[in-house]
Every structure is written in structure tokens, then in C-alpha cells.
Amino acid sequence: LEDIRFIFATHFHIDHIGGIGTLLNKCSSETRVLFDLHAKGYIEGQENLAPMKNWLSGLVPTIRENYTRIGNLSHIAFESLAGVPLPVFKDNGRLPYTDRVSYIDMQGALLSRIGFSDWEAVPTPGHTPDSISLYNEKTQELICGDLILGRHDGTGYLNRFCWDEDLASDCFAILNDVLCVRTIYPGHGEVIRDNVNAFAKVIPLEEKGGK
């Protein structure tokens, strides 16, 4: 863990950031946490988290499909309530490591080098405004946060639990057109693999009755 230089947060939700402080305590004092620039307002307490849609039709099925991955309660022992997308929690949680945070400013670019190996940052808003992914052109891998979720059969689907369904669909279409991806690591669920195009195994929102 002492060799970890960066911790990359795909978006500012508690299930993705709630354990970062615990991990940081085991890393070097030089380790930085990377967020998309859109998350700065949340972290500094100047902006509320974007409201989420489809709690019942989007979130509940995901919990049902993935709850068995929780090995013990320590896996959900979050260090603060930062990242809960409900107004009632807006003043109840601040990150305990704000001095270790850096921001990725894409400046309108589709891809941006961020300093580690062949990985590039890719803006993927839709699930949240600050959602950002990692893409490796050499290995054709994509770490996509909660834009895409995986199923037990190796397929995937666009996440209906989101801030903006249309934006998520548009973002997915752009990624499919521009990137060559054979392996997708979703925020929840099984890894999605295909020898030619892993996006072909992802069900768009319109095919799930999302529109």
C-alpha cells in the first residue's frame, strides 16, 4: 500500500468514497485522491449533490443483485456520511482528507492523461454530474464507475439509478463510437468481457424500458 500514488474516485457517492480515508491511513503521506473538478463544490460544502432518479426501479434491483458481495459489516463501515445523495444529509458529512484531494479538469477534452501509466481520464456524466472513468487504450480496458453495471452472466446494462438518463445514454453512445474496449470494470457487478467489443454486451436504457 505504501506504493500507491493515487486513489481515483469515479464519483462522489458514499459507496465509492466512504472508505478512502481508511485506505489513505495505510498509504504513503504523499498519496493523493483524484476527483473530477465537478466534485469540488460538494467537497467544499458549496453545492448539494445532484438529485437521483429511479430509486425503486434503478437502485433496488442493483442492491438485490449485489448484496451477497458484502462479506461482512466492515465493508460498509463508512468514515463519514459524505456522498449520500439525499438533502437531509447535506450538512452531515465532510471528507476527513480534504488536504489530500486533487482535481481533474478535463477542459472539454474526451481523454486526458492524468499521470499513471497508460490510463486516461474520460468524463462520463449521467449517473452523476461528476462521474469520470478511466480508459487504457493499450489494454482496451475501461473502469466506468456506475455508468454501467454488471450482471452475473457477464453482460451489463446502463444504470437507471442516475441524475440524468439522457446524458448517460448519450455518454454511452459516444464511448461506444470512440473507444475500443474489450474489458469493462463496472462500479457494481461482474466484469464484462468480449474479444472484440465489450460494449456490445451492455443493454442501453431504452431496451430496459428506461425511456
Identify what each model region corresponds to.
Residues 11, 113-114, 195-196:
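Short, solvent-exposed polar/charged micro-motifs at secondary-structure junctions
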Residues 24-25, 111-113, 133, 176:
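Short secondary-structure boundary/capping segments
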Residues 96-99, 117-197, 201, 206:
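Metallo-beta-lactamase
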Residues 208-211:
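C-terminal regulatory/interaction regions
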Residues 1-104:
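Active-site HxH/HxHxD metal-binding segment of metal-dependent hydrolases
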Residues 102-106, 110-115:
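A conserved mid-domain beta-alpha-beta active-site/ligand-binding segment of alpha/beta enzyme cores
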